[in-house]
């Protein structure tokens, strides 16, 4: 499943919140989502299970929970309005779904920035098979 996320982000001309989320991550962390976050820990990338491995992985867990509350929204592909100015991400006006998706992405990107000091290369391409602990609830 995670492979689908990376393919989606790499496709030329891809639009939607996955690409927008990638831009937010780059803005906040100065790192590309691929390869730094696409397969990180148990929750960064598509899907997730087990327990978050560290603060970075917890940002992705919380992001998954945020998207989980938006089950009726098209979280992966809905294009929303936002701006990157003066060091801040600001979500713009749109439908309720688009505004909420943007907020989920903004909060996660800011969380990843705050967690940069705890980023561990050992979790960069972490195999799903090592995420066997019982999952936390949102």
From Swiss-Prot:
Residues 1-16 form the signal peptide. The record marks 17 as: Responsible for the weak stability and toxicity. Its cofactor is Ca(2+). GO terms for cellular component: extracellular region. It comes from the Eukaryota. InterPro entries: PLipase_A2 (IPR001211), PLipase_A2_Asp_AS (IPR033112), PLipase_A2_dom (IPR016090), PLipase_A2_dom_sf (IPR036444), PLipase_A2_His_AS (IPR033113). The record marks 133 as: Responsible for the reduced anticoagulant activity (compared with CBc). Ca(2+) binds at residues 43, 45, 47, 64. Its main location: secreted. Keywords: Blood coagulation cascade inhibiting toxin, Calcium, Disulfide bond, Hemostasis impairing toxin, Hydrolase, Ion channel impairing toxin, Lipid degradation, Lipid metabolism, Metal-binding, Neurotoxin, Pharmaceutical, Presynaptic neurotoxin, Secreted, Signal, Toxin. GO terms for molecular function: calcium ion binding; calcium-dependent phospholipase A2 activity; ion channel regulator activity; phospholipid binding; toxin activity. The record marks 18-19, 23, 26, 33-34, 38-39, 76, 119 as: Putative interfacial binding surface (IBS). It catalyses: a 1,2-diacyl-sn-glycero-3-phosphocholine + H2O = a 1-acyl-sn-glycero-3-phosphocholine + a fatty acid + H(+). GO terms for biological process: arachidonate secretion; lipid catabolic process; negative regulation of T cell proliferation; phospholipid metabolic process. Expressed by the venom gland. Binds 1 Ca(2+) ion. Belongs to the phospholipase A2 family. Group II subfamily. D49 sub-subfamily. PANTHER family: PHOSPHOLIPASE A2 FAMILY MEMBER, PHOSPHOLIPASE A2, MEMBRANE ASSOCIATED. This is Phospholipase A2 crotoxin basic chain CBa2. It comes from Crotalus durissus terrificus (South American rattlesnake). The lineage of its organism: Eukaryota, Metazoa, Chordata, Craniata, Vertebrata.
